[in-house]
Amino acid sequence: LDKNRQTRILSVFEGAIYNGFFLITQGFLGTGLALEFGASEPAIALIGVLPSVSQFIQLLAPSFLRIVKSRKRAMMICAFASRLSTAFIPIALALGINGQSLLLTILAFFSLAASLTGNYWVSIIRDVAPLKGAARFFSMRNVIFTFTNMFITLFYAFILDLVPGRMGFILITAFGVASALVSLVLLGFHNDPPHEISHGRGLFRAVTKDIRFKPYLRFYSFWSFSIVITSPFFAYHELVNMKLDYSFLSILNVFSSLLTILFYLLWGKIADKIGSQAVLEFGVLGAFLKTILWLFMDTGTVYLLYIDAFIGTASWSAINLCLFTTMLDLLSGVDAQSYALLSFTNGASALVGSLVGGFFAAYLNRFTWMVGGHRFFGIQILFFVTFVLKRLFDFLEGSQDEKGGLCVGNGF
């Protein structure tokens, strides 16, 4: 078994186990954890987008790499810092120290260090993943993640319903910490092929001169901004306004996960035939269209969640698979510098979007009204805003593919 193949296999196990903690910070589990710490709507918005906002620190990735002189060493230092910090969450809950500022601080530190870890991991995996059939490799990797995430989510939801309140979150965060530490050990066995370390001059100038990459960069920043305005509040609406329990949400997650597995297999084969960009464009369209359903989500229309799950899994499986592989196609080589610029742009856009979304969510959720027997919540206005922004971007973007760039406007 050659070292590169061994690293590819390890990357699957490492990622699946690592999600034992990461899932606690996302979706309805992350929202529930934030509410357990007494988080307000703006704080929930920030917590929900910390993985994106933390990518500001990517600008330091090339400099740190030059200091330590090894991608693997840099990755392990950052991974050690991020995953060890997770232990403070169950400790804080056990001691009854549950202020939202503390949770924000812990998760911010975790996300910053994890963001740098991801930078070096992407650079390494680009050198060990097969150039031919990359989409199929990552689709199979994502299928395995979907299976493990499904069982982890069910397990955590079962604990939270069996042991409600603070004790339930102490238990699942303790499991999450154990997962994070095991994944750290597996990272240590990754192979780092020989790689020339760039001196990092002209970071913005070199990448933005690429006429194929510039439209992708512009699309990625607008995508991040418009998505994070609402992304933390879907689960918030389910838990607070619709008052759904964790068991139901976990069952819905199983339904979505099973569909996701099928779509990952489908998109992996299609992307290798027609290209990742075409599949990505379809996914983006579906992700925006599904937000319209959330205008009608309340306790009397729970069945719409299943329709939303179908559209969402078809769309997000395409996005999760092809957003990364499209980047691999557009960049001649995914080094720390080019990935840092992309991540910085994503972080800046996500920060602005989360601040805008958090501010309006705190204000809008005070209002409810009845129309034709249907109860509307003020926060649902934000869901419609995402769709409007997408159509506005299409109008402003126009024809962007004439010079070989990413077709954002005409692709739909």
Q: What does each model-found stretch correspond to?
A:
Residues 57-73, 160-161, 263-276, 361:
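Helix-to-loop junctions at the C-terminal end of transmembrane segments
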Residues 67-82, 140, 165-167, 272-285, ...:
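Cytoplasmic membrane-interface "Motif A"-like loop-to-helix N-cap segments
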Residues 79-98, 161-162, 285-300:
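C-terminal ends and interior cores of transmembrane alpha-helices
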Residues 16, 85-86, 98-117, 302-319:
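Hydrophobic core of transmembrane alpha-helices in multi-pass small-molecule transporters
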Residues 1-5, 192-220, 404-412:
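Juxtamembrane intracellular "pre-TM" segments in multi-pass secondary transporters
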Residues 114-129, 318-333:
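Intracellular juxtamembrane helix-capping segments at the cytosolic ends
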